[in-house]
């Protein structure tokens, strides 16, 4: 009879999370034992309390705190929601479970029935919608300093990866170079992945899954010794963390390929400096030295001595007219501190002048080999990227 596999990485992750929970929530118990009003102090997760650290190139939470007390009528429900969710997560860690955020919503969802001193009956739901329980999970993240992935909470897999690399996950050694026409789905707990060995010079992250599949099928990653990843649109947390680890632990440069429009550029910035709405995650999820490889406006139209990759006829054929929402988004990006470098201001100004955008697929319309064997390698070799 085969011995039962013991996942040491999983065990250590649970031990760490349980220890943090005990330490942080012990403070509340001690307040109760002293006869004090039990209170949780949380960093405020608001736009006004989000700052850009120019030195570290990261979006971070600022110094403002939120006081959540049991005896505050305006905060008591949120206080109890926080303790309820913390208990559910703690029990799941103890039981070696892997709950999803949807599981946590249902595990805590119930109705509390109570009566006023005069006898009037009341009902109060712990929470009504998942967005409420999700917000509580985020509060627990900032309170404990643990990402939900470190609490072994699962979410839907989104990102995919292929390349000349072997990893260990759940006791299995997985060769990412032997995925056939498919790819390895980046698991929602990327810190449980062990990197065994890698033979690659850089990481290429492609916004679009369809372009990722095309590059994969023609063997781009083999020929150019790359780890090829897709975020399939806006990146999920697991993909961002996986990319960060490849850069931080293995020293691989990271290049991001998106559509030439403000939404693609923002996807790049989420990988690089973090998300505005989830800035508390940036220190572990963002990759500050990620490089934007394209598609850039100067690739389309040229700039000074730089020649465009598209002819005038190709521009007429492939360019898409920008919508009002695109233009509005471009002005927003232009005002963000992290887009106020000279190169980014040039890109955004060209976009606003031309009111034109381009999808990555326009480059493949010149031939897939053009994208794979000329455009991408040439831009990497010549350092034609934006940081």
Curated annotation (Swiss-Prot):
Keywords: ATP-binding, DNA-binding, Isomerase, Magnesium, Metal-binding, Nucleotide-binding, Topoisomerase. Its cofactor is Mg(2+). One of its GO terms (cellular component) is chromosome. Its EC number is 5.6.2.2. Gene3D superfamilies: 3.40.1360.10, Winged helix-like DNA-binding domain superfamily/Winged helix DNA-binding domain (1.10.10.10). InterPro entries: Spo11/TopoVI_A, Spo11/TopoVI_A_N, Spo11/TopoVI_A_sf, Topo_VI_alpha, TopoVI_A, TOPRIM_Topo6A/Spo11, WH-like_DNA-bd_sf. Residues 12-160 form the Topo IIA-type catalytic domain. It is an enzyme of class 5 (isomerase). One of its GO terms (biological process) is DNA topological change. The active site is at 106 (o-(5'-phospho-dna)-tyrosine intermediate). CDD domains: TOPRIM_TopoIIB_SPO (cd00223). It catalyses: ATP-dependent breakage, passage and rejoining of double-stranded DNA. SUPFAM superfamilies: DNA topoisomerase IV, alpha subunit (SSF56726). GO terms for molecular function: ATP binding; DNA binding; DNA topoisomerase type II (double strand cut, ATP-hydrolyzing) activity; magnesium ion binding. Mg(2+) binds at residues 207, 259. Relaxes both positive and negative superturns and exhibits a strong decatenase activity. Homodimer. Heterotetramer of two Top6A and two Top6B chains. Belongs to the TOP6A family. This is Type 2 DNA topoisomerase 6 subunit A.
């Amino acid at each position: 009879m085969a011995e039962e596999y013991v996942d040491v990485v999983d065990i250590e992750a649970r031990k760490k999370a349980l220890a943090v929970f005990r330490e942080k929530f012990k403070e509340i118990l001690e307040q109760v034992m002293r006869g004090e009003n039990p209170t949780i102090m949380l960093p405020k997760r608001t736009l006004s309390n989000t700052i850009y650290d120019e030195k570290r190139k990261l979006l971070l939470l600022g110094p403002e705190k939120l006081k959540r007390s049991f005896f505050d009528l305006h905060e008591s429900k949120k206080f109890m929601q926080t303790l309820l969710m913390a208990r559910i997560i703690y029990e799941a860690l103890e039981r070696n479970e892997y709950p999803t955020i949807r599981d946590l919503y249902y595990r805590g969802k119930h109705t509390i029935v109570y009566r006023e001193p005069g006898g009037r009956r009341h009902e109060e739901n712990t929470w009504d919608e998942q967005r409420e329980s999700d917000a509580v999970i985020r509060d627990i993240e900032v309170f404990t300093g643990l990402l939900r992935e470190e609490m072994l909470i699962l979410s839907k897999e989104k990102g995919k990866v292929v390349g000349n690399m072997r990893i260990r996950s759940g006791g299995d050694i997985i060769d990412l170079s032997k995925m056939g026409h498919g790819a390895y789905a980046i698991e929602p707990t990327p810190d449980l992945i062990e990197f065994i060995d890698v033979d690659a010079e850089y990481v290429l992250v492609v916004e679009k899954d369809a372009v990722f599949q095309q590059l994969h099928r023609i063997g781009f990653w083999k020929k150019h010794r790359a780890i090829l990843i897709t975020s399939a649109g806006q990146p999920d947390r697991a993909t961002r963390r996986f990319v960060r680890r490849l850069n931080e632990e293995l020293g691989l440069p990271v290049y991001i390929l998106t559509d030439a429009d403000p939404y693609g550029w923002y996807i790049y910035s989420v990988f690089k400096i973090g998300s505005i709405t989830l800035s508390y995650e940036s220190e572990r999820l963002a990759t500050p030295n990620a490089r934007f490889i394209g598609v850039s406006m100067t690739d389309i139209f040229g700039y000074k001595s730089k020649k465009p990759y598209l002819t005038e006829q190709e521009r007429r054929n492939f360019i898409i007219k920008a919508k009002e929402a695109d233009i509005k988004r471009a002005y927003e990006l232009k005002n963000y501190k992290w887009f106020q470098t000279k190169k980014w201001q040039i890109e955004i100004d060209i976009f606003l002048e031309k009111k034109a955008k381009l999808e990555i697929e326009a480059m493949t319309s010149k031939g897939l080999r053009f994208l794979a064997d000329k455009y991408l390698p040439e831009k990497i070799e010549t350092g034609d990227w934006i940081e």
